[in-house]
C-alpha cells in the first residue's frame, strides 16, 4: 500500500487557528478550526491518524506561538513559514466568482 504524503497547513490567529491536511496534489483531506489557546492538543488530535511530511505555516497573527507549539508536538516535521500579506486579495483576484 502506498502512503499518500500529507501536508499540514496552518493559518494562525489570535483566538482561532485554521488547520488543513492537504495531499501532494493539493486536495484537501481534512479541515478544522482550532482554539489557539489549546493549539498543542488541537494539533495532536487533528493529526492523530496521519503523519504530515511538512508543516506550512502562515506568518500572520500569533504565528510565532503557533510555530513553537507545532515544534513541540511534531518535532520531527519541518515547518515552512509563508508570507500571508495580501493573500486574501490575491485569492479573490484569482477567483472572479467570489
At which residue positions do the language-model features occur?
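Phosphate- and other anionic-substrate recognition elements at nucleic-acid/protein interfaces
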Residues: 2-8, 14-98
